[in-house]
Design a protein with these regions (language model features):
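Compact, glycine-rich, soluble single-domain proteins
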Residues: 2-78
């Protein structure tokens, strides 16, 4: 399991445990699973997928460390 926290400038969008997270990276979408290597990556416009949810974003960054995933994102407005 992963501990996921998604933060936007307005609020904490999600905080909880998930089995995986898919994010839009600079070189394409990638999936983060348990025991993923530590990483910091820029996110591009796309969709973050987690626990059956989809969150459209304009960009941001992701940090993975010891099964903790932190996303700081700018949300896409409807």
């Amino acid at each position: 399991m992963l501990r996921l926290k998604i933060v936007s400038p307005e609020r904490i969008e999600f905080e909880g445990e998930v089995t995986s997270v898919k994010v839009p990276g600079m070189a394409g979408n990638f999936e983060i699973l348990s025991d993923h290597a530590p990483i910091i990556s820029i996110l591009t416009k796309g969709v973050v997928e987690y626990a059956g949810n989809q969150l459209p974003i304009l960009g941001g960054f992701v940090e993975v460390q010891k099964n903790q995933v932190s996303l700081c994102v700018e949300l896409k407005e409807d």
